[in-house]
From Swiss-Prot:
The keyword Metal-binding does not apply. Interacts with E1B-55k. The lineage of its organism: Viruses, Varidnaviria, Bamfordvirae, Preplasmiviricota, Tectiliviricetes. The keyword Cell membrane does not apply. It comes from Human adenovirus F serotype 40. GO terms for cellular component: host cell cytoplasm; host cell nucleus. Keywords: Early protein, Host cytoplasm, Host nucleus. This is Early E4 34 kDa protein.
Length: 289
């Protein structure tokens, strides 16, 4: 039976303490469609659930995606990487959530965490589930970046099409992770082949194509640095839209549902106002070619 952590025993201070040094230039990964060494893709044949972690309202941008990818090598210390490599087998998208039961996002859903070890149910597997849940809590509280800077998404997504949009941010151990969703598989292949996002990785998830960018420029969390980071992210999205525009027949129009989505997310994070997935996805047809 997988373990459930109903309440956080302590609040992890993912903003100031236990900061990681900047990544070395020799080992910086770059998002590509090819298989990245050390990056384990999710395989449904051998996955099994090991724990659950309760969400908070600032995780709402990821709850609507119903999955939360993260390459753990980017946020773990050297010793934690050793433990993860030797005793655990964790994929890039080990946290999923199911909100289809009642179609309502309240901000306190439970994220289900799975692993791919060869001994499901063993003591080592259960212990790894507890460790993985504690690591995932850093991401849960790192999502408070979305509540502290709610205008970040407004700046980046202003006038952007639905095919390329910024979804949310996570701040863990002095590192800022920026989540960009590429709506279609073909668009993801075109963009990743023709441009570089720098320190990043690509997640071909169960339901989403996500490019996760790493940033250390805004590690002090001052408004000036964060606004510069937002403008840099917007320039990358604009470049991706330009690349897609040269390979698509129809023009990419700005997303009409994005302003309303921003209002729903801010209402949940700031005033605890729940919303339904029907309201969030209204007016968007994901199967349109």
């Amino acid at each position: 039976m997988m373990q459930r952590d109903r309440w956080f025993r302590c609040r992890l201070s993912s903003y100031q303490t236990h900061r990681l040094p900047p990544p070395s230039e020799d080992s910086v990964p770059i998002a590509t469609m090819e298989r990245t060494p050390g990056l384990l893709e999710c395989e449904h044949l051998n996955m099994h659930y090991v724990s659950e972690v309760r969400s908070i309202p600032s995780c709402a941008p990821f709850v609507v995606l119903q999955e939360w990818p993260m390459w753990w090598d980017m946020i773990l210390s050297k010793w934690e990487k050793h433990v993860c490599k030797i005793y655990m087998r964790v994929c890039v998208c080990c946290a999923t959530i199911n909100v289809d039961f009642n179609q309502i996002v309240r901000g306190f859903e439970r994220w289900t965490i799975h692993c791919h070890c060869i001994k499901p149910g063993s003591l080592q597997c259960k212990a790894g589930g507890v460790v993985l849940a504690n690591w995932f809590k850093m991401m849960i509280y790192g999502s408070l970046y979305n509540l502290r800077f709610p205008w970040y998404r407004e700046i980046v997504n202003c006038g952007m099409p639905k095919e390329v949009l910024f979804m949310g941010s996570v701040f863990v151990r002095g590192r800022h992770f920026i989540y960009i969703r590429l709506l279609y598989d073909g668009h993801a292949a075109i963009v990743l082949e023709r441009m570089s996002f720098g320190w990043s990785f690509f997640s071909y998830g169960i339901m989403n194509n996500m490019v996760v960018l790493g940033c250390t420029y805004c590690k002090n969390l001052d408004e000036l640095s964060v606004r510069c980071c937002a403008r840099r992210t917007r320039r990358l999205l604009a470049k991706a839209v330009k690349v897609l525009g040269s390979f698509t027949v129809r023009s990419l129009m700005r997303s009409l549902v994005e302003p309303r989505r921003q209002g729903l997310l801010r209402g949940l994070m700031e005033r605890y106002c729940p919303f339904t997935l029907a309201d969030y996805n209204r007016g968007e047809n994901p199967w349109r070619a």
